[in-house]
Amino acid sequence: MDLSYWEQKEWLENIDFAIVGSGIVGLSTALFLKQRFPESNIILLEKGILPQGASTKNAGFACFGSLSEILQDLKTHSENEVLELVQSRVQGLQLLRQSLGDASIDFRAYGGYELFLEKDSAVYENCLEKMSEINALLFSIFKADIYHLVVDRFQFSKVK
């Protein structure tokens, strides 16, 4: 990249914080750094003109984990660690919504669905078997059962 003298002088000197990526994580980091260190010079670096990561492609930041993801987490983490992880995800979303406002990010809490292909029947059966147990585990966070069985909601073929 060829930068002019002025671009180098204005953009790339006296930087206190350099953040790579201008998706939700990068922008949130810049916002909170600026709030904590108002006199700091912060630069956001992005590979292209627009962000290219997950922030522009899905609403994964608004999810705390599907049933199969929570079950997978429990294979490598304790119940308390998984609870802390889910709680952190929920708090992160609450902080984002408080910081930016639901209207400005067009946030709508529609919920989510986990779809299982017919070839994933073992995972599907495991989720059905463990659903009540995971709902009980997460009840302290959500004060309600959050996972429910919905059959053929979208009428996709080869999907459970």
Briefly describe each language-model feature range.
Residues 20, 45, 115-116:
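Short hydrophobic segments within beta-strands
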Residues 86-95:
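N-terminal FAD cofactor-binding segment of flavoenzymes
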Residues 53, 57-87:
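Glycine-rich active-site loop/strand segments that organize a redox cofactor
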Residues 1-18, 35-36, 40-41:
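Extreme N-terminal leader/targeting segments of oxidoreductases
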Residues 34-57:
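Glycine-rich FAD pyrophosphate-binding loop
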Residues 68-74, 98-160:
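Flavin (FAD/FMN) cofactor-binding and adjacent substrate-gating region
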Residues 22-27, 47:
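Glycine-rich Rossmann-fold phosphate-binding loop(s) that bind the pyrophosphate
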